[in-house]
Amino acid sequence: MSDILKKIETYKLEEIAAAKAKVSLADLKAMAADQSAPRGFYKALRAKQAAGKFGLIAEIKKASPSKGLIRPDFDPPALAAAYEAGGAACLSVLTDTPSFQGAPEFLTAARNACALPALRKDFMFDTYQVHEARAWGADCILLIMASLSDDEAKRLEDEAFALGMDVLIEVHDAEETERALKLTSPLLGINNRNLRTFEVGLETSEKLAGLVPADKLLVGESGIFTFEDCQRLEKSGISTFLVGESLMRKDDVTAATKALLTGHSGILAAE
């Protein structure tokens, strides 16, 4: 695990302990049970693929550790509606506060403003967080293999499946990919950002895609800015993408989303 991930794990475990002291697991489960049924994150992405279209998981992200504030006029419901109008299949909403200025209410508000399924984008370590995600309305959770043991990942995946949620498993290298393939979820995200150096290169997706069976749905993450980037990754069998910062920086998010997915409205600026 990188030093960055270790620091995140430290504050995350403190957060989880504090949350458990405020809201019992029983109360959290009751809140989750009151939510409407999960919308089908994986199903929405497969539908785009079946229609011969690129599938986009559009990210709602206010800030990042490396770039600071990304979007000053941050309005999750408006962004969710803009992404939906632009043709996105799903949402990804940051709920981590210390590193990304995210919040649970951003997830709930964004999902309520559209018909798209939503991913809770956060660092998951405890099954309590899975119930939090469902209580806030999430349809999918993220598991980052770089920060989890095989047993931890399996436990979190099982908990999510029990709640009817989908699971996006994120990998960065061949070893993590091999471990991820032991899990059940058909959703596998390849992050093109090296968590140790923070360098980004689409070669990571191109290299790792060949290690993954055809029945998995591959998601390219990080470093995707243009329709041409999407076309490049499509040659490696990747037609679904998670994109945030490059879209979040645009004044017209709907137009930028359409441009990314169809190539009809120009090029997105690089980070």
UniProtKB/Swiss-Prot annotation:
Q: Which GO terms describe its molecular function?
A: indole-3-glycerol-phosphate synthase activity; phosphoribosylanthranilate isomerase activity
Q: What is this protein called?
A: Indole-3-glycerol phosphate synthase
In which organism is this protein found?
A: Agrobacterium fabrum (strain C58 / ATCC 33970)
Q: Which reaction does it catalyse?
A: 1-(2-carboxyphenylamino)-1-deoxy-D-ribulose 5-phosphate + H(+) = (1S,2R)-1-C-(indol-3-yl)glycerol 3-phosphate + CO2 + H2O
Q: What class of enzyme is it?
A: lyase
Which GO terms of type biological process are on file? L-tryptophan biosynthetic process
- Record HAMAP family: IGPS_B (MF_00134_B)
Q: Which InterPro entries match?
A: Aldolase_TIM, Indole-3-glycerol_P_synth, Indole-3-glycerol_P_synth_dom, Indole-3-GlycerolPSynthase_CS, RibuloseP-bd_barrel
